[in-house]
Amino acid sequence: MATQVPTKVPQDPDPFYYDYDTVQTVGMTLATILFLLGILIILSKKVKCRKADSRSESPTCKSCKSELPSSAPGGGGV
């Protein structure tokens, strides 16, 4: 009896195959960009509200203080 050798059927590429090196590189790049963007946002808010001179207030500091409910005249309690 002769046995037949199974023929190889060409398979379609697996749609769930990931190039993990590329996924890791893109993920780390996005994480770094978002991290640096967050640091810049935090630092920009601190620099904007910092007083340059104790005798005069800049207009940016007045706008920052108006956002805080506790700095309103008369106590500003809720």
Swiss-Prot record:
Membrane disposition: Single-pass type I membrane protein
Regions of this protein lying in the Extracellular compartment: 1-22
Post-translational modification comment from the UniProt entry: O-glycosylated; required for stabilization and translocation to the plasma membrane.
Chain positions covered by the region annotation Disordered: 52-78
Keywords: Cell membrane, Glycoprotein, Ion channel, Ion transport, Membrane, Phosphoprotein, Potassium, Potassium transport, Sodium, Sodium transport, Sodium/potassium transport, Transmembrane, Transmembrane helix, Transport
Glycosylation sites: T3, T7
Family: Belongs to the FXYD family.
Location of this chain's protein in the cell: Cell membrane
Lineage: Eukaryota, Metazoa, Chordata, Craniata, Vertebrata
Subunit note: Regulatory subunit of the sodium/potassium-transporting ATPase which is composed of a catalytic alpha subunit, a non-catalytic beta subunit and an additional regulatory subunit. The regulatory subunit, a member of the FXYD protein family, modulates the enzymatic activity in a tissue- and isoform-specific way by changing affinities of the Na+/K+-ATPase toward Na(+), K(+) or ATP.
Organism: Bos taurus
Protein role: Associates with and regulates the activity of the sodium/potassium-transporting ATPase (NKA) which catalyzes the hydrolysis of ATP coupled with the exchange of Na(+) and K(+) ions across the plasma membrane. Reduces the apparent affinity for external K(+), an effect that depends on the presence of external Na(+) and voltage. Increases the apparent affinity for intracellular Na(+).
Tagged with keyword Transcription: no
GO cellular component terms attached to this protein's record: plasma membrane
Record protein name field: FXYD domain-containing ion transport regulator 7
Pfam families noted in UniProt: ATP1G1_PLM_MAT8 (PF02038)
